[in-house]
């Protein structure tokens, strides 16, 4: 789902998504797919 994450303009972050980003999915079991709010 890494490619899908990129397609949705997201990036992979280990652990949790830090502000100012929000979770939009998963890259893997321990890696969140995040997207910047602005």
From Swiss-Prot:
The disulfide bridges present are 5-33, 12-27, 17-34
Q: GO CC annotations?
A: extracellular region
Q: In which tissues is it expressed?
A: Secreted into the stomach cavity.
Question: Which key words tag this protein in UniProt?
Answer: Antibiotic, Antimicrobial, Defensin, Disulfide bond, Fungicide, Secreted
A Pfam match: Defensin_beta
Q: Name one GO biological process term.
A: defense response to bacterium
- Subcellular compartments: Secreted
Superkingdom field: Eukaryota
Biological role: Has antifungal activity and antibacterial activity against Gram-positive and Gram-negative bacteria. Involved in the process of food preservation in the stomach during the incubation fast. May also be present during infection.
The subunit structure is: Monomer.
Record family assignment: Belongs to the beta-defensin family.
Name-wise, this protein is Spheniscin-1
- Per the UniProt entry, what species is this protein from, by scientific name? Aptenodytes patagonicus
């Amino acid at each position: 789902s890494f490619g899908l994450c990129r397609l949705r303009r997201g990036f992979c972050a280990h652990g949790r998504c830090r502000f100012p980003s929000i979770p939009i999915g998963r890259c893997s079991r321990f890696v969140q797919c995040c997207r910047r709010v602005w």
